[in-house]
Amino acid sequence: MQLTVVLVGIVVLVLAYLSSTGKVYPHGPQALPILGNLVQFRSLQARPDQELLRIAKKYGQLCMLWFGSNPVLIISSPKAAKDMMDQRGAIYSSRPAQNSFRATQWPWRLVTTPTGETFRLLRKIYHNLLGPQQSLHFRRYQDFESKVMLADLLDRPEAFQLGVERFALSVIFSACYQVRLDDLAHPTMTLFYSIWEQMLKYFQPGSLLLDFFPILQRLPKSMQPWLKLANSLRARELRLHRAFLSTLKKQVQNSTAVACFGTMLVKIQEKENISDERACDILAMLIGAGADTTSSYLQTFFKVIALHPNAALKAQKELDRVVGQDRLPTWDDEPNLPYVRAIIKEVHRWAPIGSLGIPHATTDSDVYDGKHIPRNTIVFPNLTALCRDAERYHNPDLFLPERFLGDDLDAYSSALHPDWRVRDHFHYGFGRRLCQGIFVAEASLYIVVSRLLWGFDIAKEEGESLDMDDKLAGLVTKPKPFRVTIKSRAPSYERVMRQERAIAKTDILSFNDVHFV
């Protein structure tokens, strides 16, 4: 009986919505009654990049689909994305109503929090933790862990994907809790992975029936099976983060802690009256988002460079001229390495680590290019199409770092530039939802990419296809396991890398020092 009422209600809503007169909506594939474009969304999940390029080619800059009775807008042109998601950010910066379940289960996380007081407070907190000056404090973690990674690559080049995963996780755990990760196989890390894998099912757009029929959230809790698993995941995740936060607070009390995101947040806790549970949510968001994106980018970098040896050779010539063979590249070298910077930008553009960005939602109706955009529309930036837009990029299907030579803007300045023709890529989002960790992320990418290109030759293995579409689906897309040949460029480079690892020191704790109750 309850299900019948739900279905009838959905039909009524769809008919009422579609019968609105005098409004022209963006074109899109024909929607089925009740189900909307469920079939198309399943195709998107199976072959995201191909489907998104097809959508952009067929429907142009705007495409309207339907999650059940809910309108979904896919934006496929850089100009429209700039106009709508940046310049009209007051309308396009919220999160979908379907996310209310996610926001309730995992509160105080920007990925789920709609616009409002909590969102504004979180933006303020993350800015205080991750701003350009604050991010400089954490370069010591990035420097140390990159040296560990280089030495690991010398000894176990075949495990490069695990090496960059460990690097990314250790940097962000060090920055959040002043605890580093020696080994991905640590039992606590295994627990984190088991939780994250299941959480992915909840955060992937379209993964829940709720995304298509949000009215199901009104059912009795006993009839919502997704709640039980979500509650369990929430409890397990909080237990882990509470232990790390407790370990950090003991260091603060003993005056043995140095500046990190966590110690800064402890000070903010007192000022803003933030509970430990909320502090854990804030730090959990940093770890989940920061580690996954950095690891995915660096794994993708290995594949891209193996496919483009000429670009690697140009970067190595630049590095040898600026840095020489007797030391590692540092951040001080960055202004003098335009080709290395161009490679970093072009990997972002040519091989984005997401197909669709995290969904936004409209808080009011809007009209763009004569098309009506209803209130509560779910809005996705079509990252695949944006990064291959022929109006923005010459020969967009080619990997050409040279296109960014002369572009001296950092990623933050580029993302905020008022001219859509200037922005380098779209990895870091839009408008009020622009990634708060952009300065920390770019510092990690620069120091690792510059040192990898300086010290190693990365080449395609004979018989390995290196298909760029061969990747794991998710909010962030990682390459599936693949093989490349990684060798030090010469004994002189290897000697420097081993010497730097031998003298590199850190005095922060390890995962073994975290105790659970």
From Swiss-Prot:
Source species of the chain: Polytolypa hystricis (strain UAMH7299)
Full protein name: Cytochrome P450 monooxygenase polD
Chain's gene name: polD
One Gene Ontology term of the molecular function aspect: monooxygenase activity
Lineage, opening ranks: Eukaryota, Fungi, Dikarya, Ascomycota, Pezizomycotina
Gene Ontology CC terms: membrane
Binding annotation for heme: C435
The keyword Transcription is assigned to this record: no
Cofactor(s) listed: heme
UniProt keyword Ligase present: no
Membrane topology of this protein: Single-pass membrane protein
Entry's localization field: Membrane
Family, per entry: Belongs to the cytochrome P450 family.
Free-text function comment from the UniProt entry: Cytochrome P450 monooxygenase; part of the gene cluster that mediates the biosynthesis of antifungal fernane-type triterpenoid polytolypin. PolD doe not seem to be involved in the biosynthesis of polytolypin. Within the pathway, the triterpene cyclase polA first catalyzes the cyclization of 2,3-oxidosqualene to motiol, polc converts the 4-alpha-methyl group of motiol to a carboxyl group, polB is responsible for appending a hydroxyl group at the 2-alpha position and polE is a dual functional P450, which can catalyze the formation of both the 1-beta-hydroxyl group and 10-beta-carboxyl group.
Chief location category: membrane
Keywords: Heme, Iron, Membrane, Metal-binding, Monooxygenase, Oxidoreductase, Transmembrane, Transmembrane helix
SUPFAM superfamilies on file: Cytochrome P450
Transmembrane regions: 5-27
Enzyme Commission number, as recorded: 1.-.-.-
